[in-house]
Structures are given as C-alpha cells and as structure tokens.
Amino acid sequence: MEILRWKIRISVLWLFMAVAMSTHSVLAFMEREVVEQMWEMEMGPGMMLFMAIFWWVPLVMAVLSVTLKDLANRWINMILGIVFTVLNIFHLTEHLAHPSAHQILIIGSTVVVTALIFWYALKWPKQET
C-alpha cells in the first residue's frame, strides 16, 4: 500500500506539470508582447514537435507512474525529473529577462514540482515483504 501511495504522489505531480504548462501557454497568449514576438518568429515543425513532446511526456509519465514496476518506475522518474527540472530552470531564466509575476509563478512551480518528482523517486521506499 505504501508503494501505491508513492506512485500516486508522483503521478499527481506529473499531472500538475502538464496543467501548469497548459496554463503557462494560455497566459502567454494573453500578453501583447508575447503575441507580437510569436508573429515575428518562425516556428518550424521541429520546434512544434519539441513543444508537443514537452507536453506529452508529463501526461504519459502520469500513467506510467502508476503502472510501471517499482525499479523501472523509480529510475525513469529520477531521470525525467532531473531532465525536466533542468529544462524548466532554463525556461525560467528566459522569462526573467522580461518578468511577469504570473509567468514566474507558473514556471517556478514547474521547477519545484519536477524537483519533487526526482526527490520522491530518489527516496522510493524499499519493497515491503
């Protein structure tokens, strides 16, 4: 039962990550400067694919976190927790150049959430016998 509780915690954190990224995008489209920048830059298929994968992975991980076996679950959550923490820190630093409180709050929360995913996976309890 203890293991299931850890799996659900991590799964909920991945869902939070996906919802926060959706919120970030919606709020970004409400900022005039962001919309103007988007019209000026060209977003190719590679960038669109990267963004889709960046959204898709947390949703897949929410499902895998409750279905994978313990060892695989622990390792994939540690690895992706670190990867997404680093990516979110990079994303946060980009927004610090032109800060808006709501974006800093949302992106900052994704840094904390992905760090917690790593932490929970690292502290995964021993299998009960």
Label each region the model flagged:
Residues M1-V19:
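Cytosolic juxtamembrane helix and N-cap/initiation of the first transmembrane helix
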Residues I3-W6, L64, L105-V112:
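Low-complexity, Ser/Thr/Pro-rich intrinsically disordered linker/stalk segments at domain junctions
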Residues W14, R74-N77, I107:
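Hydrophobic/aromatic positions within or immediately flanking transmembrane alpha-helices
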Residues L15-E31, W39-L68, M78-V86, A115:
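Core segments of alpha-helical transmembrane spans in multipass integral membrane proteins
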Residues M47-W55, H91, I104-V111:
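Alpha-helical transmembrane segments of polytopic membrane proteins
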Residues N73, V86-I106, P125:
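Membrane-helix boundary connector in multi-pass membrane proteins
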Residues N73-L80, T129:
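Membrane-interfacial loop-to-transmembrane alpha-helix junctions, especially the N-terminal start
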Residues V112-T129:
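Membrane-water interface at the C-terminal end of transmembrane alpha helices
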